[in-house]
């Protein structure tokens, strides 16, 4: 990916893919840097925000992860997985009320995973 970036430094997807590789190698700081560059080049792609949120979650930067998931939802408000993932982060933050709102929205949009989490976390 380094060579591809050298040849075409304005291609956001290359940064995203390198970020995914770094994420898989547990280099979350490096991944966040690459996702941030991808977002700077193309702030309209919700996947870049989702991916950065995953790395932020791994680093326990829960507030940052929620912010990125929220940005993704603004761009693509019908993706149940993003609501589900944001809810899981909110559970980690011990914010079950808001998590339950997201789980319910995820379920409404078709997430089967959310249904089990609603039973577990939402009373």
Located regions from the model:
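Alpha-helical tetratricopeptide repeat
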Residues: 1-123
């Amino acid at each position: 990916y380094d060579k591809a970036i050298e040849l075409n430094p304005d291609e956001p997807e290359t940064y995203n893919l390198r970020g995914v590789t770094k994420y898989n190698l547990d280099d979350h700081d490096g991944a966040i840097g690459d996702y941030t560059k991808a977002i700077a080049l193309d702030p309209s792609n919700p996947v870049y925000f989702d991916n950065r949120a995953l790395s932020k979650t791994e680093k326990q930067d829960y507030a940052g992860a929620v912010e990125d998931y929220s940005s993704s939802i603004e761009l693509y408000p019908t993706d149940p997985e993003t609501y589900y993932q944001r809810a899981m982060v909110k559970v980690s933050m011990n914010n079950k009320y808001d998590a339950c709102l997201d789980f319910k929205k995820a379920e409404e949009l078709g997430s089967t995973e959310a249904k089990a989490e609603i039973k577990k976390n939402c009373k």
